From Swiss-Prot:
Residues 1-58, 211-254, 313-353, 376-416, 421-440, 508-535 are annotated as: Disordered. Residues 22-34, 376-393, 511-535 have a biased composition (Basic and acidic residues). GO terms for biological process: egg-laying behavior; embryo development ending in birth or egg hatching; germ cell development; locomotion; molting cycle; mRNA splicing, via spliceosome; nematode larval development; positive regulation of DNA-templated transcription. It comes from the Eukaryota. InterPro entries: SKI-int_prot_SKIP, SKI-int_prot_SKIP_SNW-dom. Belongs to the SNW family. One of its GO terms (cellular component) is spliceosomal complex. This is Uncharacterized protein T27F2.1. Residues 179-342 are annotated as: SNW.
């Protein structure tokens, strides 16, 4: 028979507004008629018909306790089972609180420890307002703190004293407890019993401190046998084959490093004892992917490095070719300058050679004259006269010789002696200064017969631009100057020399040294003595 929760619960004293609001929710509609899993599904048989009834689960007890007329072990609501109690998952016994109301939050406590706090009420969801005057949140006063501290100290001292006393080999006698007075009233109230009530003084019996212990409390009690192991289902035994025997064969332990007995063990036995062949080596495929990725990255890096190196070599080759071109151009320019300088040097060398030959000839002549003058003085005078002779003059036949140096005698115009006219003859004006009335030998002279180059001789070389070239060039300035001195301006005054800066201060050092040498009393006395001697 099934019961509804509404029939079991008592009538509510006051309707809760929050509960009424929840029940008005459409989710609760039509759920009151559904059977609840928390209700008891069956009831115990009525009294007098429980001969063969054995209560096993919580549902057999209903909402009551144990049945004293049934002499079997009964655990109503799991009482007495402790940790071994077993609760069904879908069945839960009804529990009532101190106020007589059914505890519906028992469903939320399934699977949790009994001491765990489970918030299953609507008030637990709301924020709790604390009052400052509430006793639950007030700090304890000083008296309460002192009392708690004293109780804690006494408890700790008791524990420590008991530990110390148990460790001592001989203990002193325990202090006896104070006597207790008990009022005793006998159960038989008759005249033979004497007084109706009596006072009994109860005193603790004194113990002998040297008495050995009566009971062995240090003996270890064996544990109870544990629960039997769970049964393991085995397959039927089979006959061992040779392959199974070889698989289960464990080789002896043979060391790869030590052989104190000196046994000769085969290499296959050592490898079998090593156990390396029993392990299956599994190589991850990511290693191959990593190796391929590294190889591709290395190849690309090498290609990039090679490309960069080729580009650098090409740039270096271009720079080298440009530098070689510049050097070749500079070398060609230097060769041209050197060839020009060599031509100038050759011309200068030719002039120098000519001058050296002239100088050498003159030295030979001087040496010859000196030798002749030393040996034959008369011949030296004759040679001296010949040296003064003008051999460069052109001798023209039919013309008078006007060179007085050649004859050594002065020549006069004989026609002057035949005329009587002079300065006072009135042949010329007073303003004119011309002692001669006509040019002497003006018709023909030696200078007219001297060769002079004609003006138009270089027309075939320079053309008609010779006059322009002469006008553009300065007659008294060289066409080409020295390198580095062409832009210098001509100074108006004498030559001025520039004084270099004294970087190391040598001039000041020399002046200071000279002043030191000149200074002193001895120097002044010597100077005065010299002046006195000069005077």
């Amino acid at each position: 028979m099934s019961m509804k929760l509404r029939d079991i619960l008592p009538a509510p004293v006051a309707a809760d507004e929050a509960a009424s609001q929840i029940r008005r929710d459409p989710w609760f509609g039509g759920r009151d008629n559904e059977p609840s899993a928390a209700l008891v599904s069956k009831e115990p048989p009525p009294y007098g018909k429980r001969t063969s009834f054995r209560p096993r689960g919580p549902e057999d007890f209903g909402d009551g306790g144990a049945f004293p007329e049934i002499h079997v072990a009964q655990f109503p609501l799991g009482l007495g089972l402790g940790d071994m109690r077993g609760k069904p998952e879908n069945t839960l016994a009804l529990q009532y609180g101190t106020d007589g109301k059914l505890q519906h939050d028992a469903i939320a406590r399934i699977g949790h420890v009994k001491d765990k706090v489970v918030y299953s009420k609507l008030n637990d969801m709301k924020a709790k307002t604390w009052n400052e005057d509430d006793d639950d949140i007030q700090k304890p006063d000083d008296d309460a703190v002192i009392d708690a501290t004293e109780k804690t100290r006494m408890a700790l001292e008791k524990i420590v004293n008991s530990k110390v006393a148990s460790a001592l080999p001989v203990r002193h006698a325990d202090k006896l407890a104070p006597a207790q007075y008990i009022r005793y009233t006998p159960s038989q109230q008759n005249g033979a019993a004497g007084s109706q009530q009596r006072i009994i003084r109860m005193v603790e019996e004194q113990k002998d401190p040297m008495e050995p212990p009566k009971f062995k409390i240090n003996q270890k009690i064996p544990r109870a046998p544990p629960s039997p192991p769970a049964p393991v289902m085995h397959s039927p035994p089979r006959k061992m084959t040779a392959k199974d025997q070889n698989d289960w064969k464990i080789p002896p332990c043979i060391s790869n490093w030590k052989n104190p007995k000196g046994f000769t063990v085969g290499l296959d036995k050592r490898l079998a004892a090593d156990g390396r062949g029993l392990q299956q080596t599994h190589i991850n495929e990511n290693f191959a992917k990593l190796a391929d990725a590294l190889y591709i990255a290395d190849r690309k890096a090498r290609e990039e490095v090679e490309t960069r190196a080729q580009l650098e070599r090409r740039v270096a080759q271009n720079k080298k070719s440009e530098q070689e071109a510049k050097m070749a151009e500079a070398a060609a320019k230097a060769r041209q300058e050197r060839s020009a300088m060599r031509r100038k040097d050759d011309e200068d060398d030719e002039q120098v050679k000519v001058r050296e030959e002239i100088r050498r000839d003159r030295l030979d002549d001087i040496r010859k004259e000196r030798n002749i003058a030393r040996s034959r003085p008369d011949k030296a005078d004759k040679l001296r006269k010949e040296r003064e002779r003008d051999i460069s003059e052109k001798i023209v036949l039919g013309l008078p010789d006007t060179n007085q140096k050649r004859t050594g005698e002065p020549q006069f115009d004989q026609r002057l002696f035949d005329k009587t006219q002079g300065l006072d003859s009135g042949a010329m004006d007073d303003d004119t200064y011309n002692p001669y009335d006509a040019a002497w030998r003006g018709g023909d002279s030696v200078q007219q017969h001297v060769y002079r180059p004609s003006k138009n001789l270089d027309n075939d070389v320079y053309g008609g631009d010779l006059d322009k070239i002469i006008e553009q060039k300065n007659r008294f300035v060289a066409d080409k100057g020295f390198s580095g001195a062409e832009g210098s301006s001509r100074g108006s005054g004498p030559v001025q020399f520039e004084k270099d800066q004294d970087v190391f201060g040598l001039s000041s050092l020399f002046e200071h040294t000279k002043e030191k040498k000149r200074g002193g009393d001895g120097g002044d006395s010597r100077g005065e003595s010299k002046r006195s001697r000069r005077d």
